[in-house]
Amino acid sequence: MSITNEQILDAVAEMSVMQVVELIEAMEEKFGVSAAAAVVAGGAAAGAAVEEQTEFDVILESAGGNKVAVIKAVRGATGLGLKEAKALVDGAPAPLKEGVDKAEADALKAQLEEAGATVAVK
């Protein structure tokens, strides 16, 4: 008579923690294996597993040489008034927009760089 995987799982589920530990030790001894978790070699592999970023912050680093054009671009992008946009540009580096998607962040960066600003997307 053959035992199914489900029957084995049910039997293990009914065991106490000590019984499971003894079972694991017996399996390690019988099959010559170790139940220790495998160690992943290399830090680069771990870095590749990080989720892709979906929200970005657009940071105005500096206004550059054409401050008036940058203020106009900031007003158009954010809907701020003239005074608020000027204060934001004068206070650079400052966050311009936060939590936007990649396409919007790239479009905003291109628009501001065209006006002469230095912009970072993080």
From Swiss-Prot:
Keyword Ribonucleoprotein among UniProt keywords: yes
Keywords, alphabetical: Ribonucleoprotein, Ribosomal protein
Gene3D superfamilies on file: 3.30.1390.10, Single helix bin
GO molecular function: mRNA binding; structural constituent of ribosome
Gene Ontology biological-process annotations: translation
GO cellular component entries: cytosolic large ribosomal subunit
InterPro entries: Ribosomal_bL12, Ribosomal_bL12_C, Ribosomal_bL12_C/ClpS-like, Ribosomal_bL12_oligo, Ribosomal_bL12_oligo_N_sf
Pfam family name, one: Ribosomal_L12
Coiled-coil boundaries: none
Disulphide bridges: none
Domain of life: Bacteria
Record has DNA-binding as a keyword: no
HAMAP family, alphabetized: Ribosomal_bL12 (MF_00368)
Similarity comment text for this entry: Belongs to the bacterial ribosomal protein bL12 family.
Self-association and partners: Homodimer. Part of the ribosomal stalk of the 50S ribosomal subunit. Forms a multimeric L10(L12)X complex, where L10 forms an elongated spine to which 2 to 4 L12 dimers bind in a sequential fashion. Binds GTP-bound translation factors.
Function: Forms part of the ribosomal stalk which helps the ribosome interact with GTP-bound translation factors. Is thus essential for accurate translation.
Annotated protein name in UniProt: Large ribosomal subunit protein bL12
Lineage: Bacteria, Pseudomonadati, Pseudomonadota, Gammaproteobacteria, Vibrionales
